[in-house]
């Protein structure tokens, strides 16, 4: 998978604090619904912690929330998607230097429209 290779590749990793919260909630829901065992739940949380330690985590600021409230190239999108996209824009890096790793089609379409590379 290209995404896993990119996550493990050398270079700086940046993610939104929202990513960590969303992933923690998804892992918890999977455990509480019985889709994963307690052991799998613990392993997933450890993996998330390792990932978070390797990343610069960007806080969800008022500036990001304000940008998230404005239109994006491909609408409609959900609020959390808008926050992720606004976070990428807030980095202030030329889009050609940023790779967005996502499975979400709405993030993918908007990232491409904004000039970011997507995996």
Segments the model singles out, each with a brief description of its role:
Residues 2-9, 49, 66-72:
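Glycine/charged-rich beta-loop-alpha catalytic/anionic-binding loops adjacent to active sites
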Residues 1-20, 30-44, 116:
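Short, well-structured N-terminal submotif of metal-dependent ribonuclease cores
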Residues 54-106:
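Active-site neighborhoods of divalent-metal-dependent phosphate/nucleic-acid chemistry enzymes
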Residues 42-49, 65, 108:
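Hydrophobic core segments within long, regular secondary-structure runs in both alpha-
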Residues 18, 22-25, 43, 63, ...:
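Amphipathic alpha-helical interaction segments
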Residues 1, 52-55:
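Metal-dependent nucleic-acid phosphoesterase active-site entry motif
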Residues 7, 16, 20-22, 85-86, ...:
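Acidic, PIN/NYN-like endoribonuclease modules and their adjacent C-terminal/linker elements
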């Amino acid at each position: 998978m290209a995404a896993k290779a990119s996550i493990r590749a050398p270079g700086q990793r940046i993610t939104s604090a929202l990513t960590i919260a969303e992933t923690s909630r998804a892992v918890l829901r999977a455990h509480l619904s019985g889709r994963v065992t307690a052991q799998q739940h613990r392993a997933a949380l450890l993996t998330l912690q390792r990932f978070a330690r390797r990343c610069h985590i960007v806080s969800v600021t008022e500036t990001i929330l304000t940008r998230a409230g404005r239109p994006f190239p491909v609408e409609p999108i959900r609020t959390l998607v808008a926050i992720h996209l606004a976070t990428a824009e807030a980095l202030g890096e030329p889009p050609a230097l940023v790779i967005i790793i996502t499975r979400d089609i709405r993030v993918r379409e908007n990232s491409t429209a904004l000039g970011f590379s997507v995996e």
